[in-house]
């Protein structure tokens, strides 16, 4: 599979500017105007864009004298990049080798070496506020996420409600013609809305993400995730698979999603928010990873020596 325009966001702000600025320009219609095949881009001056309820056809007394009309579908501008936004859980600034840690993350290193390392993103001590800020570009209090949903209350900034006037990245990109999805942890939906009957407006599918495969809440078992959902339907794939592992299944789901896009429309840009939760308790690494990390002897010299090593690495990288 060839995925064109590939881009990974280690930080979001710079890429957001690039995407939004790319949408500026005159509106042009491709395909036959008024037909279902007609497409256009939007200029990005107003996000989200105003609804287009203009009817460009003609209605007369007979069908023969009338002209049907479909409004043009919105597509991203030519060359719009794919966007993969990855957020790890409970992994500190000095964990990955990309930021001076001793845990080898060679693919992230490669991307960072040819791109940018963002070093000034504000991260809170609990994850929900940071997640809300990341997917909206706003201070977490502005999107009701001053605390985790389990401790939310009825006061402004702390009710865990993202209102319609605070659009997520996914909603903005979807309305610019992207396909959007969320894989992994969702710790931004209020507890009282997590049920089989919703309401679902605060779930990923109600926040601009067209597809969701992941778990609701702060943590889950990697072997038997009882809070696993596909869109808004609870699923139990581990019932028929004793070897089921969520972090592996999640990666497979995301890869299948990209394969499907490429098979149906290779020119269709996508936005994927990928939020694994395996580094959050409960810690359930697979035997293969336990063996792999153990053989590296990364922590044999103890905490103080490890701290000195990470500090030295980060000074060399210039990230502190």
Residue ranges: model-predicted function:
Residues 22-26:
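Boundary at the C-terminal end of the N-terminal hydrophobic targeting segment
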Residues 1-10:
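Bacterial N-terminal signal peptides that target proteins for export
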Residues 10-18:
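Bacterial N-terminal signal peptides
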Residues 30-36, 55-56:
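N-terminal module-boundary/linker segments of secreted carbohydrate-active enzymes
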Residues 40-320:
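Formylglycine-dependent sulfatase
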Residues 5, 18-20:
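Compositionally biased non-globular segments, especially hydrophobic aliphatic-rich helices
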């Amino acid at each position: 599979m060839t995925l064109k325009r590939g881009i990974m966001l280690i930080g979001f702000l710079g890429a957001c500017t690039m995407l939004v600025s790319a949408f500026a320009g005159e509106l042009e219609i491709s395909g036959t105007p008024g037909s279902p095949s007609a497409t256009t881009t939007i200029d990005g001056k107003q996000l989200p864009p105003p609804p287009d309820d203009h009817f460009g056809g003609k209605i007369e007394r007979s069908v023969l004298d009338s002209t049907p009309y479909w409004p043009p579908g919105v597509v991203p501008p030519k060359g719009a990049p794919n966007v993969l936004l990855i957020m790890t859980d409970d992994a500190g600034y000095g964990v990955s080798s990309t930021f001076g840690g001793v845990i080898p993350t060679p693919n992230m290193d490669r991307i960072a070496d040819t791109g940018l390392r963002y070093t000034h993103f504000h991260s809170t001590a609990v994850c929900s506020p940071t997640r809300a800020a990341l997917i909206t570009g706003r201070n977490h209090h502005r999107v009701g996420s001053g605390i985790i949903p389990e401790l939310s209350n009825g006061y402004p900034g702390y009710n865990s409600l993202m209102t319609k006037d605070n659009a997520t990245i996914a909603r903005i990109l979807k309305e610019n013609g992207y396909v959007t999805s969320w894989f992994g942890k969702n710790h931004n939906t209020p507890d009282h809305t997590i049920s089989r009957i919703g309401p679902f407006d605060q779930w990923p599918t109600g926040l601009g993400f067209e597809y969701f495969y992941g778990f609701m809440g702060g943590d889950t078992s990697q072997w038997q995730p009882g809070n696993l959902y596909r869109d808004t339907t609870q699923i139990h794939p581990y019932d028929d698979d004793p070897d089921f592992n969520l972090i592996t299944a999640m990666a497979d789901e995301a890869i299948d999603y990209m394969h499907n896009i490429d098979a149906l429309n290779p020119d269709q840009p996508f936005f994927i928010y990928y939020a694994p939760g395996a580094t959050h308790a409960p810690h359930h690494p697979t035997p293969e990873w336990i063996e792999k990390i153990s053989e590296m002897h990364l922590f044999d010299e103890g905490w103080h020596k490890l701290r000195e090593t990470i500090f030295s690495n980060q000074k060399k990288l210039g990230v502190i």
